[in-house]
Amino acid sequence: MAAVAHLAAHPELPRPTLRVGFTPDEEVGEGATLFDVEGFGAVCAYTLDGSQPGELQDETFTGVQVTLTIDGVDVHTGWATGKLVNAARLAARVLAALPADTLTPETTSGREGFVHPFEVRASAGHAVVRMTVRDFEEDRLEQHVELVRRTAEEVVGAEPRARLGFEVQRQYPNMRDHLRDYPEVVSRAERALRAEGIEPVRIPIRGGTDGSVLSARGLPTPNLFTGGHEYHSVREWASLQDMASAAAVVVHLAEAWAAR
Protein backbone atom coordinates (compact mmCIF):
# COMPACT_ATOMS: atom_id res chain seq x y z
CA MET A 1 0.00 0.00 0.00
CA ALA A 2 2.97 2.33 0.58
CA ALA A 3 3.98 1.82 -3.05
CA VAL A 4 0.43 2.48 -4.28
CA ALA A 5 0.19 5.62 -2.13
CA HIS A 6 3.52 6.85 -3.50
CA LEU A 7 2.44 6.30 -7.10
CA ALA A 8 -0.89 8.02 -6.44
CA ALA A 9 0.92 11.01 -4.93
CA HIS A 10 3.33 11.23 -7.86
CA PRO A 11 1.36 10.99 -11.11
CA GLU A 12 4.48 12.09 -13.01
CA LEU A 13 6.12 8.71 -12.34
CA PRO A 14 5.81 6.35 -15.31
CA ARG A 15 3.60 3.33 -14.84
CA PRO A 16 1.30 1.08 -16.87
CA THR A 17 -2.29 0.39 -15.86
CA LEU A 18 -1.95 -1.20 -12.44
CA ARG A 19 -4.18 -3.63 -10.58
CA VAL A 20 -3.87 -4.31 -6.83
CA GLY A 21 -5.29 -7.41 -5.20
CA PHE A 22 -5.43 -8.82 -1.68
CA THR A 23 -5.76 -12.55 -0.98
CA PRO A 24 -6.77 -13.09 2.66
CA ASP A 25 -6.55 -16.89 2.87
CA GLU A 26 -3.00 -17.55 1.66
CA GLU A 27 -1.87 -19.28 4.84
CA VAL A 28 -4.57 -21.92 4.57
CA GLY A 29 -3.87 -22.55 0.90
CA GLU A 30 -7.04 -20.92 -0.40
CA GLY A 31 -5.80 -17.41 -1.17
CA ALA A 32 -6.03 -17.69 -4.95
CA THR A 33 -8.56 -20.48 -5.41
CA LEU A 34 -11.48 -18.12 -6.05
CA PHE A 35 -9.46 -15.12 -7.19
CA ASP A 36 -11.11 -13.56 -10.26
CA VAL A 37 -8.17 -13.74 -12.68
CA GLU A 38 -10.23 -12.65 -15.68
CA GLY A 39 -11.82 -9.76 -13.82
CA PHE A 40 -8.44 -8.68 -12.46
CA GLY A 41 -7.46 -7.95 -16.05
CA ALA A 42 -3.67 -8.15 -15.73
CA VAL A 43 -1.09 -9.75 -18.03
CA CYS A 44 1.11 -10.66 -15.06
CA ALA A 45 1.31 -10.11 -11.31
CA TYR A 46 3.78 -10.21 -8.43
CA THR A 47 3.17 -11.43 -4.91
CA LEU A 48 5.04 -9.85 -2.01
CA ASP A 49 5.52 -12.84 0.24
CA GLY A 50 9.28 -13.31 0.44
CA SER A 51 11.85 -12.65 3.12
CA GLN A 52 15.38 -11.34 2.56
CA PRO A 53 15.99 -8.24 0.42
CA GLY A 54 16.58 -9.22 -3.19
CA GLU A 55 14.60 -12.43 -3.16
CA LEU A 56 12.97 -13.06 -6.52
CA GLN A 57 11.37 -16.45 -6.77
CA ASP A 58 9.85 -18.22 -9.73
CA GLU A 59 9.95 -21.76 -8.34
CA THR A 60 8.10 -23.38 -5.45
CA PHE A 61 7.44 -26.78 -4.03
CA THR A 62 4.54 -28.75 -5.41
CA GLY A 63 2.41 -29.42 -2.36
CA VAL A 64 -0.20 -31.99 -1.39
CA GLN A 65 -1.89 -32.88 1.87
CA VAL A 66 -2.30 -36.53 2.82
CA THR A 67 -5.00 -37.49 5.30
CA LEU A 68 -5.02 -40.92 6.92
CA THR A 69 -8.11 -42.14 8.76
CA ILE A 70 -7.86 -45.26 10.87
CA ASP A 71 -10.88 -46.98 12.38
CA GLY A 72 -10.23 -49.45 15.16
CA VAL A 73 -12.52 -51.41 17.45
CA ASP A 74 -13.28 -49.60 20.69
CA VAL A 75 -14.63 -51.65 23.59
CA HIS A 76 -14.68 -51.27 27.36
CA THR A 77 -11.18 -51.79 28.68
CA GLY A 78 -12.49 -54.11 31.38
CA TRP A 79 -13.32 -56.80 28.82
CA ALA A 80 -11.08 -55.69 25.94
CA THR A 81 -8.92 -58.82 25.87
CA GLY A 82 -8.78 -60.10 22.30
CA LYS A 83 -11.32 -57.51 21.17
CA LEU A 84 -9.87 -53.99 21.34
CA VAL A 85 -8.12 -52.62 18.24
CA ASN A 86 -6.59 -49.30 19.27
CA ALA A 87 -6.62 -46.79 16.41
CA ALA A 88 -4.37 -44.40 18.35
CA ARG A 89 -1.66 -47.05 18.65
CA LEU A 90 -1.95 -47.90 14.96
CA ALA A 91 -1.51 -44.22 14.07
CA ALA A 92 1.58 -44.07 16.28
CA ARG A 93 3.02 -47.14 14.57
CA VAL A 94 2.48 -45.61 11.13
CA LEU A 95 4.35 -42.47 12.16
CA ALA A 96 7.13 -44.50 13.78
CA ALA A 97 7.54 -46.51 10.57
CA LEU A 98 8.12 -43.40 8.42
CA PRO A 99 11.69 -42.13 7.93
CA ALA A 100 12.90 -39.96 10.82
CA ASP A 101 16.51 -39.28 9.83
CA THR A 102 15.65 -38.33 6.24
CA LEU A 103 12.66 -36.95 4.34
CA THR A 104 11.57 -34.60 7.15
CA PRO A 105 11.58 -30.77 7.17
CA GLU A 106 14.22 -30.75 9.90
CA THR A 107 16.60 -33.07 8.00
CA THR A 108 16.26 -31.66 4.46
CA SER A 109 17.29 -28.48 2.69
CA GLY A 110 17.80 -27.00 -0.76
CA ARG A 111 15.88 -28.96 -3.35
CA GLU A 112 15.05 -31.93 -1.12
CA GLY A 113 11.42 -32.73 -0.46
CA PHE A 114 9.83 -34.09 2.70
CA VAL A 115 6.91 -35.71 4.48
CA HIS A 116 5.63 -33.71 7.46
CA PRO A 117 2.98 -35.04 9.86
CA PHE A 118 1.50 -31.88 11.36
CA GLU A 119 -1.70 -33.00 13.05
CA VAL A 120 -2.81 -36.14 14.87
CA ARG A 121 -6.24 -36.57 16.45
CA ALA A 122 -6.74 -39.97 17.93
CA SER A 123 -8.89 -42.05 20.22
CA ALA A 124 -9.02 -45.78 20.68
CA GLY A 125 -11.72 -46.09 18.07
CA HIS A 126 -10.72 -43.52 15.47
CA ALA A 127 -7.59 -41.65 14.42
CA VAL A 128 -6.88 -38.94 11.84
CA VAL A 129 -3.34 -38.09 10.75
CA ARG A 130 -2.68 -35.16 8.44
CA MET A 131 0.60 -34.68 6.60
CA THR A 132 2.02 -32.23 4.11
CA VAL A 133 4.14 -33.75 1.36
CA ARG A 134 6.44 -31.48 -0.66
CA ASP A 135 8.93 -31.68 -3.51
CA PHE A 136 10.08 -29.62 -6.47
CA GLU A 137 9.69 -32.53 -8.90
CA GLU A 138 6.37 -34.25 -9.57
CA ASP A 139 7.84 -37.75 -9.86
CA ARG A 140 9.61 -37.47 -6.50
CA LEU A 141 6.45 -36.08 -4.90
CA GLU A 142 4.53 -39.12 -6.11
CA GLN A 143 7.23 -41.37 -4.63
CA HIS A 144 6.86 -39.68 -1.23
CA VAL A 145 3.07 -40.07 -1.33
CA GLU A 146 3.43 -43.72 -2.31
CA LEU A 147 5.84 -44.27 0.60
CA VAL A 148 3.22 -42.94 3.02
CA ARG A 149 0.50 -45.05 1.41
CA ARG A 150 2.56 -48.24 1.46
CA THR A 151 3.67 -47.69 5.05
CA ALA A 152 0.11 -47.07 6.26
CA GLU A 153 -1.25 -50.08 4.39
CA GLU A 154 1.43 -52.37 5.83
CA VAL A 155 0.95 -51.20 9.42
CA VAL A 156 -2.84 -51.01 9.46
CA GLY A 157 -3.20 -54.04 7.20
CA ALA A 158 -1.47 -56.18 9.81
CA GLU A 159 -4.66 -55.84 11.89
CA PRO A 160 -7.51 -57.22 9.73
CA ARG A 161 -10.22 -55.67 11.90
CA ALA A 162 -8.89 -52.13 11.38
CA ARG A 163 -9.88 -49.95 8.44
CA LEU A 164 -7.69 -47.41 6.64
CA GLY A 165 -8.75 -44.37 4.64
CA PHE A 166 -6.23 -42.54 2.45
CA GLU A 167 -6.90 -39.16 0.82
CA VAL A 168 -4.58 -36.93 -1.21
CA GLN A 169 -5.51 -33.28 -1.71
CA ARG A 170 -3.60 -31.12 -4.18
CA GLN A 171 -2.63 -27.79 -2.62
CA TYR A 172 -0.41 -25.91 -5.06
CA PRO A 173 1.85 -26.62 -8.07
CA ASN A 174 5.45 -25.64 -8.71
CA MET A 175 5.01 -22.30 -10.46
CA ARG A 176 8.24 -22.89 -12.38
CA ASP A 177 6.34 -25.07 -14.81
CA HIS A 178 3.98 -22.20 -15.64
CA LEU A 179 6.43 -19.28 -15.54
CA ARG A 180 9.07 -20.68 -17.88
CA ASP A 181 7.09 -19.37 -20.86
CA TYR A 182 7.15 -15.80 -19.47
CA PRO A 183 10.83 -14.88 -18.97
CA GLU A 184 10.07 -11.17 -19.36
CA VAL A 185 8.00 -11.20 -16.16
CA VAL A 186 11.06 -12.26 -14.18
CA SER A 187 13.61 -10.16 -16.06
CA ARG A 188 11.66 -6.95 -15.43
CA ALA A 189 11.58 -7.76 -11.72
CA GLU A 190 15.35 -8.19 -11.83
CA ARG A 191 15.60 -4.77 -13.44
CA ALA A 192 13.44 -3.24 -10.69
CA LEU A 193 15.58 -4.77 -7.96
CA ARG A 194 18.78 -3.45 -9.50
CA ALA A 195 17.21 0.00 -9.88
CA GLU A 196 16.88 -0.01 -6.08
CA GLY A 197 20.53 -1.06 -5.74
CA ILE A 198 19.67 -4.62 -4.78
CA GLU A 199 21.15 -7.64 -6.52
CA PRO A 200 18.50 -10.28 -7.26
CA VAL A 201 18.67 -13.43 -5.15
CA ARG A 202 17.22 -16.36 -7.10
CA ILE A 203 16.38 -19.22 -4.76
CA PRO A 204 13.47 -21.68 -4.93
CA ILE A 205 10.79 -21.39 -2.26
CA ARG A 206 10.64 -24.31 0.14
CA GLY A 207 6.92 -23.71 0.37
CA GLY A 208 4.27 -22.11 -1.79
CA THR A 209 2.68 -18.75 -2.48
CA ASP A 210 -0.54 -17.60 -4.08
CA GLY A 211 1.58 -17.11 -7.19
CA SER A 212 1.75 -20.89 -7.54
CA VAL A 213 -2.00 -21.14 -8.05
CA LEU A 214 -2.32 -17.88 -9.99
CA SER A 215 0.43 -18.93 -12.42
CA ALA A 216 -1.29 -22.27 -12.96
CA ARG A 217 -4.53 -20.39 -13.66
CA GLY A 218 -2.90 -18.35 -16.42
CA LEU A 219 -1.66 -15.27 -14.54
CA PRO A 220 2.17 -15.52 -14.35
CA THR A 221 3.05 -14.42 -10.81
CA PRO A 222 6.58 -14.65 -9.39
CA ASN A 223 7.32 -13.64 -5.80
CA LEU A 224 9.26 -10.71 -4.32
CA PHE A 225 10.65 -10.04 -0.86
CA THR A 226 8.92 -8.13 1.94
CA GLY A 227 11.48 -8.22 4.76
CA GLY A 228 9.65 -10.78 6.89
CA HIS A 229 11.58 -13.30 8.98
CA GLU A 230 10.95 -16.38 11.15
CA TYR A 231 7.69 -17.07 9.32
CA HIS A 232 5.12 -19.30 11.05
CA SER A 233 6.90 -19.10 14.39
CA VAL A 234 6.15 -17.28 17.64
CA ARG A 235 9.16 -15.07 16.84
CA GLU A 236 7.94 -13.84 13.43
CA TRP A 237 9.08 -10.29 12.71
CA ALA A 238 9.65 -7.85 9.84
CA SER A 239 12.30 -5.25 9.09
CA LEU A 240 10.86 -1.77 8.51
CA GLN A 241 13.84 -0.85 6.32
CA ASP A 242 13.37 -3.95 4.18
CA MET A 243 9.64 -3.25 3.89
CA ALA A 244 10.47 0.24 2.62
CA SER A 245 12.88 -1.27 0.09
CA ALA A 246 10.17 -3.68 -1.07
CA ALA A 247 7.78 -0.77 -1.63
CA ALA A 248 10.47 1.06 -3.62
CA VAL A 249 11.02 -2.03 -5.77
CA VAL A 250 7.30 -2.06 -6.61
CA VAL A 251 7.58 1.55 -7.78
CA HIS A 252 10.59 0.63 -9.93
CA LEU A 253 8.66 -2.37 -11.23
CA ALA A 254 5.85 -0.10 -12.40
CA GLU A 255 8.43 1.99 -14.23
CA ALA A 256 10.00 -1.12 -15.78
CA TRP A 257 6.64 -2.16 -17.23
CA ALA A 258 5.83 1.37 -18.39
CA ALA A 259 8.79 1.08 -20.75
CA ARG A 260 7.34 -2.05 -22.33
Residue ranges and their predicted role:
Residues 1-27, 66-70, 76, 81-101, ...:
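Alpha-helical metal-binding/catalytic segments enriched in His/Glu/Asp
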Residues 1-61, 103-104, 108-109, 114-118, ...:
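Acidic/histidine-rich catalytic neighborhood of metal-dependent amide-processing enzymes
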Residues 18-19, 43-46, 66-67, 201, ...:
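Structural motif
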Residues 36-40, 62-63, 85-86, 146-150:
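Short, solvent-exposed amphipathic alpha-helical segments in soluble enzyme
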Residues 52-55, 76, 230-232:
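Short gly/pro/ser/thr-enriched loop/turn and capping motifs at secondary-structure boundaries
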Residues 56-58, 78-81, 204:
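Short histidine-centered beta-strand/loop micro-motifs
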Residues 57-69, 191, 222:
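Acidic-glycine-rich active-site phosphate/pyrophosphate-binding loop
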Residues 87-260:
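Metal-dependent amide/peptide-bond hydrolase catalytic core
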